[in-house]
Swiss-Prot record:
InterPro entries: NAD/GMP_synthase (IPR022310), NAD_synthase (IPR003694), NH(3)-dep_NAD(+)_synth (IPR022926), Rossmann-like_a/b/a_fold (IPR014729). This is NH(3)-dependent NAD(+) synthetase. GO terms for biological process: NAD biosynthetic process. It holds the Pfam family NAD_synthase. It comes from Lactiplantibacillus plantarum (strain ATCC BAA-793 / NCIMB 8826 / WCFS1) (Lactobacillus plantarum).
């Protein structure tokens, strides 16, 4: 095993194999424990895209909230799923299929296009040119603004979808989808998430589809693997301690080192990881 590979696996707490049922229960208990400890919280809020990660996080959240209601008799516990399209999005049918599967207590829909476009217009009024990639990150941050707006009114915490395969590559928007209160998928790679969804009898097309962040307008539905330059199978193998090609390992490690700032709080004078 490569030296940095061992360090990454340890840092991200990835197991070489999982028992899906055990990990499902682990995530549910984790979500419940956070609510039990923080009695002022009564809801979990999660943005739903129709992809694998939000489908899994959403189902686990729904199961945790259902158990909290049953065990406490407190009907204020709710899971709020939020659709956050930018105008009309191609994944709408998948998003609704995911919501049907997870059976959220409340489903909200907020179109982020007006707020995103207004922000871009305001920035460009200052002689800035907002490129498409940057605008994509603005979309991701607008989505998190909405989720925190809902959570703030509903005594809630925002659930994140980050997992080990995203964490190792930094493939998320800082203070966008990377900004959340609790992340029940942390420790899992992409392959393990699929195993859990299969165990939960999720619609197969929701986790067999090609993963895409779909934030860029110039490159709509750009596959994650194209953007990253490495396959998820290679990322998963690497995180499970397996041997991958030197090219794949070097690409993964380059992403890990380049995106270290995303896995840390704001840098202080006491931090030296970036030096």
């Amino acid at each position: 095993m490569r030296p940095l590979q061992a360090e990454i696996i340890k840092a991200l707490h990835v197991a070489p194999t999982i028992d899906p049922e055990v990990e499902i229960r682990r995530s549910i208990d984790f979500l419940k424990a956070y609510l039990t400890k923080n009695t002022f919280l009564k809801t979990y809020v999660l943005g739903i895209s129709g992809g694998q990660d939000s489908t899994l996080a959403g189902k686990l959240t729904e199961m945790a909230i259902t158990e909290m209601r049953q065990e406490t008799g407190d009907d204020r516990y709710q899971f709020i799923a939020v659709r956050l399209p930018y105008g009309n999005q191609a994944d709408e049918a998948d998003a609704m299929a995911a919501i049907d599967f997870m059976q959220a207590d409340v489903t909200d829909r907020v179109d982020i296009q007006p707020a995103t476009d207004a922000m871009v217009t305001a920035l460009e009024a200052n002689q800035l040119t907002i490129h498409d990639f940057n605008k994509g990150n603005i979309k991701a941050r607008q989505r998190m603004i909405v989720q925190y707006g809902i959570a703030g009114e509903m005594h809630g915490a925002v659930v994140g979808t980050d997992h080990a395969a995203e964490a190792v590559t930094g493939f998320y928007t800082k203070y966008g989808d990377g900004g959340a209160d609790i992340v029940p998928l942390w420790r899992l790679n992409k392959r393990q998430g699929k195993q859990m969804l299969a165990a939960l009898d999720a619609p197969k097309h929701l986790y067999d589809k090609v993963p895409t962040a779909d934030l860029e307008e110039d490159r709509p539905a750009l596959p994650d693997e194209v953007a990253l330059g490495v396959r998820y199978d290679d990322i998963d193998d690497y995180l499970e301690g397996r041997t991958v090609s030197d090219a794949a390992a070097e690409k993964i490690e380059a992403w890990y080192l380049k995106t270290a700032h995303k896995r840390h709080a704001a840098i202080t004078v006491f931090d030296d990881f970036w030096k």
